[in-house]
Design a protein with these regions (language model features):
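Core catalytic lobe of class I
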Residues: 1-279, 283-292
């Protein structure tokens, strides 16, 4: 891993093209009074991210509901293609003044256009696909049997079952025992069968006693996004790494990591957290590198 203190636009300009497999970041939301938080990252910053990502690489950026449009436009104007929007449900936030209770944070999901066909791009650059099958959301109970609300058992068209009168009854496919297909909602929703990956806000224990960063994301959340959008043994860029949660998650998932932050204070915290994670990873997985 590498943690760098500096302006991310300046730092990235020293890198060559097509370096990273993915960018997963939690940048300033443009909602504060400080100089670094008076606006969302500029098009020029995202252009440097675009330049250093491999063709087909994904760029995920957290943002506020109020300025999602501005973040998405800047990312798109840098050359990315907007592919999706993920909603992280954050139901523990408290309402402020005369407003609705904040309950989610959106994530812009964008992709650097791939070269030629998706298969050829993946063969050449090692990215462009997302890993959904290995990141299914596990059933809370036994996989549902029979038809359940929400379509856990799907009708299949083109494979005919029996015919009753003039109506055709088609076959069905049972629910996948490994869980539901991951969705673009991350959070907790009441259900007989868990529909979404659950990622509560980071606890004080997870942050560390000396971590005073105001918007620390949970490690499980970042690890989940990395597993889906960054190939195994790939590299993750975080140009606004803060206290290093993305780096810790990347190391847990056996990905390379480069983090950049303007604050020397937070890069020191990020370096310390990643160092602890590195030692823990080596102790728990002494033969990890030999398995690949």
């Amino acid at each position: 891993y590498s943690i760098i203190n500096g302006n991310c636009q300046d730092v990235l300009s020293t890198y060559g093209e097509n370096i990273f497999h993915s960018c997963i970041t939690d940048p300033p939301y443009g909602m504060g009074m400080d100089d670094w938080d008076h606006s969302v990252p500029t098009v020029e910053i995202w252009q440097e991210v675009y330049r250093t990502l491999k063709p087909g690489g994904f760029c995920l950026s957290f943002c506020s509901p109020e300025l999602y449009h501005r973040m998405a436009v800047n990312v798109e104007d840098a050359g990315f293609v907007i592919k999706d929007q993920i909603m992280w449900m954050t139901t523990t936030k408290m309402p402020k003044h005369n407003r609705l209770k904040p309950a989610h944070e959106p994530i812009v999901v964008a992709q650097k256009p791939y070269e030629g066909s998706l298969k050829n791009n993946h063969d050449k650059w090692g990215c462009g696909l997302i890993d959904t099958d290995n990141n299914r959301v596990a059933w809370e109970k036994e996989p549902p049997k029979g038809w359940v609300k929400g379509g856990a058992k799907r009708r299949t068209f083109g494979r005919e079952g029996k015919t009753t009168g003039s109506q055709k009854e088609f076959g069905t496919v049972d629910a996948n025992p490994n869980g539901r297909y991951p969705s673009n909602i991350i959070g907790s929703v009441q259900s007989d069968h868990q529909k979404y990956f659950y990622a509560p806000r980071a606890t004080r224990k997870e942050k560390g006693k000396d971590n005073d960063h105001p918007t620390v994301k949970p490690i499980d959340l970042m690890a989940y996004l990395i597993r889906i959008y960054c190939p195994i043994k790939g590299s993750v860029l975080d140009p606004f790494c803060g206290s290093g949660t993305t780096g810790v998650a990347a190391m847990r998932e056996d990905r390379e990591f480069v983090g950049i932050d303007l604050s020397k204070h937070y890069t020191e915290i990020a370096t310390q957290r990643c160092s602890v994670e590195e030692v823990s990873h080596l102790v728990l997985n002494p033969l990890a590198d030999m398995l690949y």
